[in-house]
From Swiss-Prot:
It comes from Homo sapiens (Human). The lineage of its organism: Eukaryota, Metazoa, Chordata, Craniata, Vertebrata. It is found in: Cell projection, Cilium membrane. The chain crosses the membrane at residues 23-43, 262-282. This is Transmembrane protein 231. Its main location: membrane. Glycans are attached at residues 194, 199, 221. Belongs to the TMEM231 family. One of its GO terms (biological process) is embryonic digit morphogenesis. It is linked to Joubert syndrome 20: A disorder presenting with cerebellar ataxia, oculomotor apraxia, hypotonia, neonatal breathing abnormalities and psychomotor delay. Neuroradiologically, it is characterized by cerebellar vermian hypoplasia/aplasia, thickened and reoriented superior cerebellar peduncles, and an abnormally large interpeduncular fossa, giving the appearance of a molar tooth on transaxial slices (molar tooth sign). Additional variable features include retinal dystrophy and renal disease. Meckel syndrome 11: A disorder characterized by a combination of renal cysts and variably associated features including developmental anomalies of the central nervous system (typically encephalocele), hepatic ductal dysplasia and cysts, and polydactyly. It is a multi-pass membrane protein. Transmembrane component of the tectonic-like complex, a complex localized at the transition zone of primary cilia and acting as a barrier that prevents diffusion of transmembrane proteins between the cilia and plasma membranes. Required for ciliogenesis and sonic hedgehog/SHH signaling. InterPro entries: TMEM231. GO terms for cellular component: ciliary membrane; ciliary transition zone; MKS complex. Keywords: Cell membrane, Cell projection, Ciliopathy, Cilium, Cilium biogenesis/degradation, Disease variant, Glycoprotein, Joubert syndrome, Meckel syndrome, Membrane, Transmembrane, Transmembrane helix.
Length: 316
């Protein structure tokens, strides 16, 4: 009958030597070479300490019903028309003030409690001699993130579009995107930018100047921008028809970069260290077995009797 190897187990051997012997020195050296180089390899291969990480979240966005509109007119009626939801701004406009009809609606498409888009429509009544060649529009939003970092801010969508031909309607369909110059910190409340984009209480014209508003906004490290590469300018307005701005602004899911917390960094570093360490442990185990079996360093070999056998002898 042919015999097969059905089971095997290693026999344990120990090697004895003094604590100050060459063998002890060799073991110390081997331990150092096993545990320290993986650390250096992990460290030198970059990304040992996780500095930035990212996650996805749909922000909670709310239109704040603040609007600032400047409509640039054709040369025959020189200048512009303006209107905003800020009484102080409107007072400054004199006879350039023209009150439009505004209707807005926020929609939650997937019924998850977060609004997904804003439908904004503005109809600016015009006299038959007035022609709109360009539009500057600011809408403000309250913008919140919850999942990793709690961010609360007031942000804006700035829309500017102009065309050489007088328009009847401007159609915009774009995303309100988050722009980060800096990763968010993990945990805690970030209300640094929970300040209004336009200071509506100020009586000074300077505070409503578009260059000033945009410049102050761009100083921020976290902003939102309206991203619509192709606003559509429709022409052919009837003499008594208003100029219409039709905007659909979507609130998409964002990839948010943040600074990981301490334990996340430690976990990431540990995983890298251990996966390299395993290779070193395996290699040095072979080296140690070779060195002791072949008596490269002098020791006294002892074969340890397996424990089970000892027990058995004791019992019988
Ligand atoms: C953010 O600002 C709004 C309006 O000023 C205020 O009602 C709200 O409490 C603020 N939120 C935080 C977290 O500071
Ligand atoms: C808004 O303007 C008023 C008047 O100039 C000023 O007192 C107030 O501090 C301003 N608020 C902010 C938030 O800048
Ligand atoms: C904005 O980011 C820069 C660079 O990361 C940083 O030095 C600065 O302190 C940040 N400003 C604020 C107000 O957090």
């Amino acid at each position: 009958m042919a015999l097969y190897e059905l089971f095997s187990h290693p026999v344990e051997r120990s090697y004895r030597a003094g604590l100050c012997s060459k063998a002890a020195l060799f073991l110390l050296l081997a331990a150092a070479l096993t545990y320290i180089p993986p650390l250096l390899v992990a460290f030198r291969s970059h990304g040992f300490w996780l500095k930035r990480s990212s996650y996805e979240e749909q922000p909670t966005v709310r239109f704040q019903h603040q609007v600032l509109l400047v409509a640039l007119l054709g040369p025959e009626s020189d200048g512009f028309l303006a209107w905003s939801t800020f009484p102080a701004f409107n007072r400054l406009q004199g006879d350039r003030l023209r009150v439009p009809l505004v209707s807005t609606r926020e929609e939650d498409r997937n019924q998850d409690g977060k609004t997904d888009m804003l439908h904004f429509k503005l109809e600016l009544p015009l006299q038959s001699t007035e022609h709109v060649l360009g539009v500057q529009l600011i809408l403000t939003f309250s913008y919140r993130l919850h999942r990793m970092a709690t961010l609360v801010m007031q942000s804006m969508a700035f829309l500017q579009s102009s065309f050489p031909v007088p328009g009847s309607q401007l159609y915009v369909n774009g995303d309100l995107r988050l722009q980060q110059k800096q990763p968010l910190s993990c945990g805690g409340l970030d209300a640094r930018y929970n300040i209004s984009v336009i200071n509506g209480t100020s009586p000074f014209a300077y505070d409503y100047d578009l260059t000033h508003i945009v410049a102050a906004y761009q100083e921020r490290n976290v902003t939102t921008v309206l991203n619509d590469p192709n606003p559509i300018w429709l022409v052919g307005r009837a003499a008594d028809a208003p100029f219409v701005i039709n905007a659909i602004i979507r609130y998409p899911v964002e990839v948010i970069s943040y600074q990981p917390g301490f334990w996340e960094m430690v976990k990431f570093a540990w995983v890298q260290y251990v996966s390299i360490l395993l290779i070193f442990l395996w290699v040095f185990e072979r080296i140690k077995i070779f060195v002791f079996q072949n008596q490269v360093v002098t020791t006294i070999p002892v074969t340890v009797t397996p424990r089970g056998d000892l027990c058995k002898e004791h019992l019988s």
